[in-house]
UniProtKB/Swiss-Prot annotation:
Role, per record: Phenylacetaldehyde dehydrogenase that catalyzes the last step in the aerobic styrene degradation pathway by mediating oxidation of phenylacetaldehyde to phenylacetic acid.
A molecular function GO annotation: phenylacetaldehyde dehydrogenase (NAD+) activity
Keyword Oxidoreductase part of the UniProt annotation: yes
Keywords of the record: NAD, Oxidoreductase
TM spans (from-to): none
Record's protein name: Phenylacetaldehyde dehydrogenase
Catalysis performed (reactions): 2-phenylacetaldehyde + NAD(+) + H2O = 2-phenylacetate + NADH + 2 H(+)
Catalytic center residues: 273, 307
Binding site for NAD(+): 251-256
Length: 502
């Protein structure tokens, strides 16, 4: 197994970009102990970009042991909270200083538009790091009065303290590779935990570069480890490792169930941010053009590869035809192509496998009798994993598969409704409950619908708006626990009680 303290300067390069191809364990850049590798692809072309280690049980064991040792080390355990804060703030500065590089690397590996990579991956990641850095110095306990009887000459003092949970396993998806990594590691490190991060096998490159910058920011060796590999090997070993105290996972509900079950058996803390099938509800008073633009943004942002994508559109019957006609115009006008090209509005699906899965869902919509308004299965580009923006009209309110199955792509089904009770019932029929949006000028109606929706986040006249101070998570099959804000801090700390008799 090859080891080095710094990332190899002779890495493969594309257009001047260094492409990481080793993982970080204990402050050293290493290959897998098996020397096996995984290919990493450019989804805009289907070409191989580089390869990364195909980590397995032995590599996970090494990473967790490193994280556990650092957790107990004076370098980390005795580090003042203000020092952890400074490291995270420096890391935010480094992300911005290397913003162009990181954005291009993300677009090459993930396929998203370069502007999204700059704004959401780099810009938002820096914002989240700065917000979570502040929590390092603001963890508080409480002082309590006890009621149990004591001898007359004995008094007591009691207090609580928020302490790190321990080694955190952070397993992230491929749709926002850099941002999702920061969503996990920033609160974990701010609270004094150590982390083993496993990025998605499709999109590991910016996570590896993030780890390199974290070392440059002053993070002690072993505080952050990155293991690349497949979910069924590296991910499974990480979830089951006895020295991992908490698992933080974002991904599919299917995998989330497996992880949650494993954590339950081993009594690990776990937070799961899982699938979604978010409804977009347009009331009769909404301007049809605003409704169409809002619905298009809700489903086509990031190529539809968003857990809260507004994939179920419900429009009041009085403006239904007007709205879907305007939506069709928007869908047909979207330019599909490489995220690095000027004038492109939507990039590729992340992988060949996912591309085929999205096309299967489109075929299901056609087979189930929905009206294809725009898009479809025809390839818009000669190469790469591209899908046309696709809109189905479900005028007859059929119980089609697209209403229940998460597509995770640019595929929308639009259904009319006649009254509030009907649309609330339809919105809540999904097994998912991650997000929902309501489009109206009637605030009273919006608030009444909000009270009935089974969703972790409800937006009014916007969609997909998140903030580091705003808790984010789902109801029902969309997961357990919350990201962001004070709610996230609770998941990365536990309570120690102290009682003094004197």
């Amino acid at each position: 197994m090859t080891r080095s303290l710094t990332m190899n300067s002779s890495l493969p390069a594309i257009d001047g970009l260094r492409l990481p191809h080793q993982m970080l364990i204990g402050g050293q850049w290493v290959n897998a102990q098996s020397d096996k590798t995984l290919n990493v692809y450019n989804p805009a072309t289907g070409d191989t970009l580089t390869d990364v280690p195909d980590g397995d049980v032995e590599d996970v064991n090494a990473a967790v042991e490193s994280a556990a040792a650092t957790l107990q080390s004076d370098a980390w355990r005795r580090m003042p909270p203000s020092a952890r804060e400074r490291i995270l703030l420096r890391l935010a500065d480094l992300l911005e200083a290397h913003g162009d590089e990181l954005a291009r690397l993300e677009t090459l590996n993930n396929g998203k538009l370069l502007i999204y990579s700059k704004m959401m991956e780099v810009g938002a990641s820096a914002q989240w790091l700065r917000y979570m850095a502040g929590w390092a110095t603001k963890l508080t306990g409480s002082t309590l009065d006890l009621s149990l009887p004591l001898p007359p000459d004995v008094r007591s003092r009691a207090s609580t303290q928020r302490v790190p949970v321990g080694v955190v396993a952070a397993i992230i998806p491929w749709n926002f590779p850099l941002l999702m990594a920061v969503w996990k590691i920033a609160p974990a490190l701010a609270c004094g935990n150590t982390v083993v991060l496993k990025p998605a096998e499709e999109t590991p490159l910016t996570a590896l570069r993030l780890a390199e910058l974290a070392m440059e920011a002053g993070l002690p060796a072993g505080a952050l480890n990155v293991v690349t590999g497949r979910g069924e090997t590296a991910g499974d070993a990480l979830v089951r490792h006895p020295k991992v105290a908490k698992v933080a996972f974002t991904g599919s509900t299917e995998v989330g169930r497996i992880i949650g079950s494993a954590c339950g058996r081993s009594l690990k803390a776990v937070s799961l941010e899982l699938g979604g099938k978010s409804p977009v509800i347009v009331l009769a008073d909404c301007d049809p053009q605003e409704a169409a633009e809002g619905a298009a943004a809700a489903i086509f942002f990031n190529h539809g590869q968003v857990c809260t994508a507004g994939s179920r559109l419900y429009v009041h019957e009085s403006i239904y035809e007007d709205v879907i006609q305007r939506l069709a115009v928007i869908g047909e006008s979207i330019v599909v192509g490489s995220g690095l090209e000027q004038g492109v509005h939507m990039g590729p699906m992340v992988s060949k496998k996912h591309h085929e899965n999205v096309l299967r869902h489109i075929r299901n919509g056609i087979e189930d009798g929905a009206d294809l308004i725009c898009g479809g299965t025809e390839a818009p580009c000669a190469q790469g994993f591209f899908v046309k923006p696709t809109i189905f009209a479900n005028r007859e309110k059929k119980d089609i598969r697209l209403l229940s199955q998460e597509v995770f792509g640019p595929v929308l089904v639009a259904t009319p409704f006649s009254d509030i009770a009907e649309v609330v019932n339809e919105a809540n029929r999904s097994v998912y409950g991650l997000g929902a949006s309501i489009w109206t000028n009637d605030l009273s109606a919006a608030l009444r619908i909000n009270d009935e929706l089974e969703a972790g986040t409800v937006w009014v006249n916007t969609h997909n708006m998140v903030d580091p101070n705003l808790p984010f998570g789902g109801f029902k099959d969309s997961g357990v626990g919350r990201e962001h804000g004070a709610a996230a801090i609770e998941h990365y700390t536990t309570t120690r009680s102290l009682v003094i008799a004197y």
